[in-house]
Amino acid sequence: QNNTVVATIMSNMGLFKAMKREGIEVCVTTVGDKYVNEAMVANGYVFGGEQSGHIIFSKHATTGDGILTALMLMEVILEKKQSLGTLCKGMQMYPQLLKNVRVEDKAAVIGNARVQVEKDRISTALGEDGRILLRESGTEPVIRVMVEAQSDELCAKYVDKMVQVIREEGLAVE
């Protein structure tokens, strides 16, 4: 319905690219099934979820339900008469690496000029084939550094560089 899927900012780039290729809009929210559900209700969307596996079918429930998700997936497999592997071939998952950096002041990290310059440099280097996210945890005194790229090696290289800059700026708690 509404040809839109609701997903969080942490969803894999492969999802965004696959949806675009299929002509499906993606409404992006902050992390948390609460925010996914809020966007679904506010806009009349019927399907959304987050990378952690919380998949919401608003016609049936307001929270993620693993059994419901499995049943809905089985319905698609039977309807399309294709294996799950065949159905998934159209989506390339990008390698992704996430590191948590313990900090005293999350806002200071996000607002730090050198951190932002390095983030922009990495983003430019990755281009259309990757991305970097710096996100304040909502539950812990950490900054989450996430990189998606064409290879695990590139993910590690850029995550390590970003963490190094945060440490060099004296923002990390060792």
Enumerate the predicted regions with their spans.
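Phosphate-binding and adjacent anionic-ligand microenvironments
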Residues: 1-174
